[in-house]
């Protein structure tokens, strides 16, 4: 549940005074099998070692998984030479007849229990390790932002792939209202089945869909890259996503289930990129994952293009105001990027940082973990360890009483409960002092190196009146540093 005391954070139902801070790495195949190199499906679907994945997260101090739903049984990644031929899917493959992959067609009125068994097992296994899981009901990205023709022809709801006479031709037939009543009824049955399968697990959050369409027009060059002719009309999924949220809420209430936090994430494309997050903020969802909304991209372009400036969400995120819990996911503003400073900046601005971790596409135990390259396992290690470090600080502090207070430090990064606790980031690594405006009192001080991850205990500081107090990072700590101040004798 969202804390009434500080709506930037969740709390557990019986303890509204303890914030639940979420952070972790995620990747496309953490639920399904079938992702690997090359455009064609493998004869035997590739498997992620889920137990090793949980070990990998736990070792780095992570406590959150974005559990991916990929709806195509045959597809490829945009711009990447690898396939996503994902199995199991929620519906039984009974035939008669063969689907596009030459395996039996789907019966969309019969569930594949192996999918739901795996779904429950993975959420439960994460819970046993103290991790929360956001379960994604649907995926939009694969239906309109992955290469043609398999973006649609590799989906169970394509006419060639099922025995039920259902035939979608684009994302507009699947995630944009009004829908064919038969399609919507099948979606409703599936959503209810997912909720029935997982409702009693305490570590559960929901997500409607990853990057569904938002009513904007595709750039023709981008559409051509995907193999889609002309300017595709993808429609606006907003009303449909609100319908899914309402459906989940109604079903939980009707069945007497515990209510789990609902999330809505960035849509693409949208008519005005600077307003990309407006439907999320206006939604009935408790948590959101925003997308890039920088003015520099108002006329087109995006932060993933070569030579493009980076989004503020990566480099200088806005402070969370508590309108929604913000799970800040690099997937929506900086896929393929993320470092230690990103994690710390996001945390000190009141967000929950999670990493779209391309470094584990090949698994969490690569043959050479130290091998270099921008998408290598090693490239993302600083971000991974930093996420765990932010969590350790979050759980030491009374985070529920703290808020982003950029005005209290000359660095622009402070999370504070004035007069009690302050956590300050000096991001530049420049030699020399910075200031923190403190309330009167005595404070214990502790320094932490963002890159080296080592601590230095500082001398106690006493201030007689509210004033900007100067602090100089210890010479032993090179690079960006964190200063933790806690009132002496505080409860």
Model-derived features: where do they sit?
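Active-site mouth of glycoside hydrolases
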Residues: 4-285
